Amino acid sequence: NADVIYVTNETKNTVTYNGLTGIGNILKNASRISKPLAVRIIGTIDTQTRDADGTKTTDINNGVVAIDGLTDKIISNGKDSYFNMLDVTGSKGGLTVEGIGDDANILKWGFTFKSNCQDVEVRNLTFSKYPEDACAAENSKYFWLHNCVFNIGENKYDITEEQDKGDGDGATDMNGNSNVTIAYCRYNQTHKTSLNGGSDSVKSYNYTYHHNFFNGCKSRLPLTRQVNLHMYNNYYLNCGTCIDARASA
């Protein structure tokens, strides 16, 4: 009995649901959705972000993104950037975001499921050139991510003090959640691949990674803090590190 909406690059800002227009605005207001919803992605959804390099003095607001509802802040002299992210907040009705066919791509943007989202499924999507996180979850529960591909990210406006976002931030960062499964995903040359626990004091519960392929990845495969983690049948090929368990993980 789920509602279903289809999204293409041409309709990303015009699709309507629940009195909202544009896929960014629909999911940003997911707390207003009370029944199961399936969002079906067809083809490549592109922000069309320009590729010019930024610097530490760059201050660009509004005009970086081409999907309504995404974050668009790049702050000069700040410690961090946060743009081209879709913050999906408070979804409790049951949400699925899935690609249709073998060419469903999220290009130059990503998702963060936060503020007590629950019963979320993300499947059959390819994430590429994301400047921040590709598909992350914070303070949420019952999150199932499977059959997705994560290619290397790209952030040409990296103004962080560490200058470590050139390849994007995390592919699948999971912080402060419970009951998370990541399965049958492929990671290609990702840098800060998967962080579980943003600090030594944030606790997470019941994470499982299984049947994932880490192909030439650099780090955080995953990096875990304060979480009980079950990993099995994952394959690592030419990676910089492997599992990095810290802080009572």
Where do the protein language model's features map onto the residues?
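Long, ordered, amphipathic alpha-helical scaffolds
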Residues: N1-I5, T71, A249
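Right-handed parallel beta-helix/beta-solenoid
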Residues: N1-L20
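Acidic glycine-/aspartate-rich tracts in secreted/extracellular proteins
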Residues: T11, T44-T47, D102-D103
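Extracellular beta-strand-rich solenoid/capping regions of secreted or surface-exposed proteins
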Residues: N18-K35, R50-T96, N105-R123, S128-K141
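Acidic, glycine-rich low-complexity segments
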Residues: I41-G43, T96
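Right-handed parallel beta-helix
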Residues: G93-D103, Q118-K129, K141-K156, T160-E161, ...
